[in-house]
Amino acid sequence: MPLLESTLHIRHLGRQDYESVWHAMQHYTDNRDENSQDEIWVVEHTPVFTQGQAGKSEHILNPGDIPVIQVDRGGQVTYHGPGQLVIYPLLDIKRLKVGVRQLVTHIEQSIVNMLKRYDVEAYAKADAPGVYVEERKVASLGLRIRKGCSFHGLALNVDMDMSPFQRINPCGYAGMEMIQCKQLGGPQTVEEAGKQLVETLSQELGLANLVHHQGLPESL
């Protein structure tokens, strides 16, 4: 495998508002060509509800002072906020020879594998994307594929204020109970979770050569 195809660039973005990162990953994806590098963006967002393309307004119960943004990913409404790890895999899945369903499985399995390091038994569900522990949801997924390339990604609850989830039906499921790593004895900080999950995700994708960066690409 050529070096370009086997190298994964990891960008650590820190805490950012949702909209600017969303527009940056749209721009990155729209301007990709066959030589563009694959990247994973690791970020923590300020509080926001995002409504996916399948989203129905009745699932947003009482947003209050938290903004609601309609976005171009799959899925329904979810919440992002401090203490939650968000990872955006910006991958040329055509070049990697990975199908969309296969990519979802790789992402879910990487979370399961990461939590297994902490003796937490997690699992995916065929009918409801995400990762669960004892029927409570610890991670949400929502992807978009454009020109054979992925953007958007996953959100893992680590150590956060969970109360905003009560203002919505998470992922369109009324009464869906959410849980976080801190309660489970998993990683206790976003930084720790990010380090572990980048490892298991790159292993799942078969990409061993990792190059770390701080901040967005200079071209954005």
Swiss-Prot record:
Its EC number is 2.3.1.181. The keyword tRNA processing does not apply. One of its GO terms (cellular component) is cytoplasm. Keywords: Acyltransferase, Cytoplasm, Transferase. It comes from the Bacteria. Belongs to the LipB family. Substrate binds at R73, G74, G75, Q76, V77, T78, Y79, H80, S140, L141, G142, G153, L154, A155. Catalyzes the transfer of endogenously produced octanoic acid from octanoyl-acyl-carrier-protein onto the lipoyl domains of lipoate-dependent enzymes. Lipoyl-ACP can also act as a substrate although octanoyl-ACP is likely to be the physiological substrate. GO terms for biological process: protein modification process. Residues 34-209 form the BPL/LPL catalytic domain. It comes from Shewanella piezotolerans (strain WP3 / JCM 13877). Signal peptide: none annotated. GO terms for molecular function: lipoyl(octanoyl) transferase activity. This is Octanoyltransferase. The active site is at C171 (acyl-thioester intermediate). It is an enzyme of class 2 (transferase). The gene is lipB.
